[in-house]
Design a protein with these regions (language model features):
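Terminal, low-structured helical/coil segments at or just beyond the last alpha-helical repeat
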Residues: 26-45, 136-170
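Structural marker of alpha-solenoid helical repeat scaffolds
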Residues: 74, 108, 141-145
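Start-of-helix register in tetratricopeptide repeats
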Residues: 46, 80, 97, 114, ...
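Alpha-helical segment of the N-proximal tetratricopeptide repeat
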Residues: 43-77
Length: 170
């Protein structure tokens, strides 16, 4: 019974954190509860950040890039911002810049689950299944229970494998 209560409390905490993050509720541990959050939790999200996140919802990737670049000039220690910037560059097909920005996010917050998920998706986009699977293993170690980021990347890896079967060996 005690274990059930502990699990229920953890799930409740995870859900409330996810809801706060989805509503734009600050650092939340660095992008979906990525870890300790570090200095990121003290960053005040300004008009550029908020406009960029509206643009994310509208899939206006060029606007995300413009507004988030302006934001990170003033707030270079915000892992969430670097992650979203990488996301936008990935969506426009600029994988080189996306990889650099995901790297910046993970340097700030090595446990940033959203950055690990998006980095794995970028590796799949680049055709690098091995590195995508490495990000999946990292997410597996970061998530207490299977988290959203792990589940989404796992589904993307599964889809990639079904669309790119291994070549037959001789």
């Amino acid at each position: 019974m005690r274990n059930l209560l502990l699990i229920a409390a953890c799930i409740s905490l995870a859900l409330s954190s996810s809801i706060a993050h989805a509503a734009g509720g600050g650092g939340g541990g660095g992008g979906g509860g990525g870890g300790g959050g570090g200095d990121n939790e003290r960053v005040v999200k300004d008009a550029d950040y908020k406009a960029a996140m509206v643009a994310v919802k509208a899939s206006d990737w060029n606007q995300v890039i413009t507004r988030m670049n302006a934001y990170v000039e003033r707030n270079p220690g915000d892992a969430d911002a670097w992650n979203e910037l990488g996301h936008a560059y990935r969506k426009t097909g600029d994988l080189d810049t996306a990889f650099k920005d995901y790297g910046k996010a993970l340097k700030i917050d090595p446990k940033h689950r959203d950055a690990h998920e998006y980095l794995g998706e970028a590796y799949l986009q680049a055709g690098d299944l091995g590195r995508a699977e490495a990000e999946l293993r990292t997410l597996d170690s970061l998530c207490f229970l299977p988290c959203e980021q792990y589940s989404e990347l796992k589904a993307q890896v599964r889809r990639y494998k079904s669309e790119h079967p291994p070549l037959a060996t001789r």
